[in-house]
Amino acid sequence: MKVSKLWLREWVNFSLTEQELAEQLTMAGLEVDAVNPVAGQFTHVIVAEVLNTKPHPDADKLTLCEVNINKDKPLKIVCGAANVRPGLRVALAMIGAHLPGGLQIKESKLRGELSQGMLCSATELGLAEHSEGIMELSDEAPIGMDLREYLALDDHVFDIDLTPNRADCFSILGVAREVAVLNKLPLIEQPIVTVPPAIDDGLRVNLIHSEACPRYCGRIIRNLNLEAKTPLWMAERLRRGGIRTLHPVVDVMNYVMLELGQPMHAFDLSKINGEINVRYSASGEQLELLDGQEVVLNDNVLVIADKEKPLAMAGIMGGANSAVQEQTQHIFLESAYFNPVTIAGVARKYGLFSDSSQRFERGVDPCLQSKALERATELILSISGGEPGPVIESFDKKFLPGTVSFLFDTTKVKKLTGLSIPLNEMKNLLEGLGVVIIKETNHFFEVTIPSHRVDLQQDADLVEEIIRLYGYDKLQAQPMQTSVQAGLISAKEKIATHVSSWFSAKGYHETISYSFVDPELQEALYPQKEFMELLNPISSELSQMRAGMWPGLIASMIYNSHRQQTAVKFFEIGVVFDLDGGQLKERSCIAGLLMGEQGNLNWSESARLFDFYDLKGDLQSLFASLKLDDVEFIQSSHHALHPGQSAQIVINGKHSGWIGVLHPRLSDAFDLDQDVVLFELNLESLINPTIPLYKPISKYPQIRRDLSFLVDRQISAMQIERVIRNTVKEDWLKSFDVFDVYMGKGIPEDKKSIAVAMTLQDDTRTLVDAEINLTISAIIKKLENEFSILLRE
């Protein structure tokens, strides 16, 4: 934001030097990058009037001029500018004048004709980078007056780098508010005249998407003077604000934006068909912009349109098809409030940048639109004349930002900064910002935030405002005085930490993968699920939210296996996303996989590959560390797992996950030549709500009994274990292990032999053989009844 010091002083009468003001603004958070004079250094340049002209007798491109400088005798000047003419008031460098670049003006003869000075262009005076012809001054410019005084060129421009939260300072008014409160000076409000309508003409405004544009003000002005030109004072202020002049109407739009902070736009009324519609564009609509670029719009770009076509990209740039031009006689003025979320990012997406988009992205004052429209109308009428219609205002209160009010705890100033500031001083600083203090109760202020400060939403924001206005330099190094409460760690966080440490200790490597996955891989693993598609993915290979942990783990495993990793042990803890009836639900999971050789080369045993039981054993060990006793592995089928080597994991009677070997079909598709064993569990299922109780180690002997059964092949060891545990007296069965499974010679084809070992123990006494024998008999009888199992001798 470029701010003229003299323009700023019209709003607040300060007496600071340029350096002092720059330091003050920077310390208050408005960083001043540079302070530059508004014009080059020159002397003895005055306002003069061209009385008459005639061609140079010896040069076709030179003109002989008589110039009035309000002295007894006019001066003779030789000029080469094409725009020199009688009656024109110009900038004359007198004999002895020094111009930028070291040029000194002397009396001389050009092609034999006397020249007693030089008529200057804006470029020669350092007032513009490019200019055509000599500088043309207003007809009211006082002849003989020093040009620096007439144009107020003893001025400086402050180039301020604004942080994203200070959208309110994108105007002279906004910076003036800061200077006023910093120096405890009154803000000089500039009156805005309400212009009464001279005609009844208006346009219908339809807020089709009012959530994106909740307020739109407009006004027709007819019969502009086509000969009008932007006054020099306005052109100079625009130049100092970094904006070049284009057309009187457009210049007024830019002037009001610099002055008040409200971006505006003017349309050629003759190019508008019937009405104004504020809507999102249809995909594929095209619009040629003011800069000549033609853009193809997608369906999320807010546009200003008439009945048949888009006229402008709302808040970003107008269209060439409705632009104000030299022959434009009737105009429609726009002053609107656009939701910052709607504008943010759209300009960058299309490679566009404008002063309007910069302001709308950060948020303008939602109450400023009608005031800015009245100010623009007043200026246009004073420059170009015309007949204004009534102000048209359409709004949707539901989507307009509401008044922000809350209870401010003033003790937080001391808590957060360590600085003790009197309550009265805090009150004065806040009121200087425009904050209304409705009520004071003890150390609380009930406050209402002004509409232009969209960044003030909570206590911490007001603390920041108070301390920056009070002065960061008044902060002294001292220990902070505050109360600290230890944060509570949730049960899920504790489980995640335990599981991560446990797997790491087991030699697993933790992976962290994207929550976005390859849709082909995910759909191959979970064909029965729905998936959330990303609207704007990083790439086509990462276009779905993951519905399980396996896609990321398998992708990491494939990457490593293709790089000669002979043993892969991975686990990952993360969030998966289930799509349930169109609603996205998050779920925390733990998953892992094994592939390759188990262990290192060893002289005492041969190498082997990881199998189902390696991973199952690791999980059983994990469950034991978490004191989870009610865990079952129930043989079941999963689309991604081997039909004969897959199981559901049931914890405390609830389905909690899966374990198994990757389906051969998928192994072939992924070009894997070894089995991949993997599991996935809901993390919350590992939370054990029971409180562990102290229990001494039993001093009574353990008794082992081995039993061998002949069972149908489809009967699992888990089913046998469940029957045994339900039969043995509570707390007697200390362990249950399957130590042999045999199918083959001597065993019927539809049968198998399972041998199990049971360890029995009572914690209060020694078990006797009679009790043990009764228990074994009960087990055998129960198994015979349930599964027709036979005890092998």
Curated annotation (Swiss-Prot):
<dbReference type="Pfam" id="PF03147">
    <property type="entry name" value="FDX-ACB"/>
</dbReference>
<dbReference type="GO" id="GO:0006432">
    <property type="term" value="P:phenylalanyl-tRNA aminoacylation"/>
</dbReference>
<dbReference type="InterPro" id="IPR005146">
    <property type="entry name" value="B3/B4_tRNA-bd"/>
</dbReference>
<feature type="domain" description="B5">
    <location>
        <begin position="401"/>
        <end position="477"/>
    </location>
</feature>
<dbReference type="Pfam" id="PF03484">
    <property type="entry name" value="B5"/>
</dbReference>
<feature type="binding site">
    <location>
        <position position="455"/>
    </location>
    <ligand>
        <name>Mg(2+)</name>
    </ligand>
</feature>
<feature type="domain" description="FDX-ACB">
    <location>
        <begin position="698"/>
        <end position="792"/>
    </location>
</feature>
<dbReference type="GO" id="GO:0005524">
    <property type="term" value="F:ATP binding"/>
</dbReference>
<dbReference type="GO" id="GO:0004826">
    <property type="term" value="F:phenylalanine-tRNA ligase activity"/>
</dbReference>
<protein>
    <recommendedName>
        <fullName>Phenylalanine--tRNA ligase beta subunit</fullName>
        <ecNumber>6.1.1.20</ecNumber>
    </recommendedName>
</protein>
<dbReference type="InterPro" id="IPR012340">
    <property type="entry name" value="NA-bd_OB-fold"/>
</dbReference>
<keyword id="KW-0963">Cytoplasm</keyword>
<keyword id="KW-0648">Protein biosynthesis</keyword>
<feature type="domain" description="tRNA-binding">
    <location>
        <begin position="39"/>
        <end position="148"/>
    </location>
</feature>
<keyword id="KW-0820">tRNA-binding</keyword>
<comment type="subunit">
    <text>Tetramer of two alpha and two beta subunits.</text>
</comment>
<keyword id="KW-0547">Nucleotide-binding</keyword>
<keyword id="KW-0694">RNA-binding</keyword>
<dbReference type="Pfam" id="PF03483">
    <property type="entry name" value="B3_4"/>
</dbReference>
<keyword id="KW-0479">Metal-binding</keyword>
<dbReference type="InterPro" id="IPR041616">
    <property type="entry name" value="PheRS_beta_core"/>
</dbReference>
<dbReference type="Pfam" id="PF17759">
    <property type="entry name" value="tRNA_synthFbeta"/>
</dbReference>
<dbReference type="GO" id="GO:0000049">
    <property type="term" value="F:tRNA binding"/>
</dbReference>
<feature type="binding site">
    <location>
        <position position="461"/>
    </location>
    <ligand>
        <name>Mg(2+)</name>
    </ligand>
</feature>
<keyword id="KW-0460">Magnesium</keyword>
<keyword id="KW-0436">Ligase</keyword>
<dbReference type="InterPro" id="IPR036690">
    <property type="entry name" value="Fdx_antiC-bd_sf"/>
</dbReference>
<comment type="similarity">
    <text>Belongs to the phenylalanyl-tRNA synthetase beta subunit family. Type 1 subfamily.</text>
</comment>
<dbReference type="Pfam" id="PF01588">
    <property type="entry name" value="tRNA_bind"/>
</dbReference>
<dbReference type="InterPro" id="IPR005121">
    <property type="entry name" value="Fdx_antiC-bd"/>
</dbReference>
<dbReference type="InterPro" id="IPR002547">
    <property type="entry name" value="tRNA-bd_dom"/>
</dbReference>
<dbReference type="GO" id="GO:0000287">
    <property type="term" value="F:magnesium ion binding"/>
</dbReference>
<keyword id="KW-0067">ATP-binding</keyword>
<dbReference type="InterPro" id="IPR045060">
    <property type="entry name" value="Phe-tRNA-ligase_IIc_bsu"/>
</dbReference>
<keyword id="KW-0030">Aminoacyl-tRNA synthetase</keyword>
<feature type="binding site">
    <location>
        <position position="464"/>
    </location>
    <ligand>
        <name>Mg(2+)</name>
    </ligand>
</feature>
<dbReference type="InterPro" id="IPR033714">
    <property type="entry name" value="tRNA_bind_bactPheRS"/>
</dbReference>
<dbReference type="InterPro" id="IPR009061">
    <property type="entry name" value="DNA-bd_dom_put_sf"/>
</dbReference>
<feature type="binding site">
    <location>
        <position position="465"/>
    </location>
    <ligand>
        <name>Mg(2+)</name>
    </ligand>
</feature>
<dbReference type="InterPro" id="IPR005147">
    <property type="entry name" value="tRNA_synthase_B5-dom"/>
</dbReference>
<dbReference type="InterPro" id="IPR004532">
    <property type="entry name" value="Phe-tRNA-ligase_IIc_bsu_bact"/>
</dbReference>
<dbReference type="GO" id="GO:0009328">
    <property type="term" value="C:phenylalanine-tRNA ligase complex"/>
</dbReference>
